[in-house]
Structure formats: C-alpha cells, structure tokens
Amino acid sequence: ALANVQLNLQSAFRNCFEKSRKRQNGFPKFKSAKHSRKAYTTNNQKGTVAIIGNAIKLPKIGKVKAVIHRRPDADWIIKSATVSQDGDGKYYVSVLFEFARNITPVPISDNAVGLDYASDGLYVDDKGNTGTNHKYYRESHKKLAKEQRRLSRMKGSKKGETKSGNYIKQLRKVNKIHRHISNQRLDNLHKISAEIANQYDVVCVESLDMKAMSNKGFGNGKATMDNGYGLFLNML
C-alpha cells in the first residue's frame, strides 16, 4: 500500500513537470486526513489478496464478509485490490485481475450514426430518434432538500464547529440520497451507451464544453448536470 502511494506521488510530480502535455497539471496539493479520499490500493503478494467464498482476504485485516459482484474464473490472477469508503459509510473493494483471452475480430461495416446533445432527453440522432433519460436529480430533489435542511440545523454544520454524532448520521443520509441518484444515472447511461456501441460501428458526436454549458449564465446548469451527457460520451 505504501509503495502505491509513493508511485502515485511520483506520477503527480511527473505530470506536473512534463512539458509535452497539451494541458499541464498543477503542482501536487497536500491533502489533509479530514478531507482526503478514503481509499488505498494494496498489491497481491503470494496470496495476501484472495476471494474465499463470500469473503475477501486483505493484508493485515484477514477475511472480511463481502457481497461478491462477479465471480472470477479459476485461471484469473489477482494483481491488486483497492479499498474505498463512500460518503454514506459503506466500504467497497475493487479487485484487478489478469487473464488471457482470445479476441474474435468483429466484421467491419458502414453502419454509422450521428448524435447531438438534447437537454430534454439525452441525445438526438441523425434519424430524429431521441434517447430516453430520466431527470433523476429532480425526481429526488424534494427528499434531498428536506434532509439537507435537517443537516444545516445540526451542530457541526457551521465552519469551525465540532461535528456531532447526529450531524455525521444525517450527513450519511444525505450522501446516501446522492449515491442513489448517481447509481440511477450510471445504470441508465451504461445501458444506453452499450446498446449504441453494439448496434453501430461508427458514432459521430459534436465536441461540446459541458462545463461551460452548465454555467449559471445559461440558466440551465442543473438540467445539464442532471443529463449526464459528458459521462455518456466517455462511456461510448
């Protein structure tokens, strides 16, 4: 785990001083323990990381009960595991495997489609078809606002105040709603992007600055961010 931290630091400095990059990154910033991302990566060394039944084995921790999302095949080799804690207090382990697989070439055709951004749905293609996309943030907005008001009245909401136990519990409730909205959006975008990728060989899209479009000056920042079009393009 410590070796991976050192490698991440080395990579951050290399990206900072590398002049050949089109967009140069800034100098690495110190992250305090209070505001750091609660995650670490550990390497598998002689079986220190393993999936055993309904548990996962981690260095210095041992076996921990887990919900296994996907069972690995017998010939898969575990390389590393990343343990992270979400804002709602849940822990996740992402395991990196190495395995050999024969890739069958896919026949190339001229099946192509053009997509354009649509604020009401998700996209409009060159045939006039629109993508189905729910406004997940707006659907949960009232519930989220109610829990956020409760959070703002608790001890610890003001700067410099010590966060009380009730504040931390309420903060997890707010983060749980945010996670629910995010999971809904991700699931929908994964399904739509996979359907398009399987149906077409070439997908043409317009290069848009989504950050600029979500600016308050346009008056549709919330709708743009709730749309998730930029994430949809990354998935494609």
Question: Where does each model-flagged region fall?
Answer:
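Acidic carboxylate diad motif detector
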Residues: A1-G87, K222, D226
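Positively charged, helix-rich recognition surfaces that bind polyanionic ligands
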Residues: A74, G87-L236
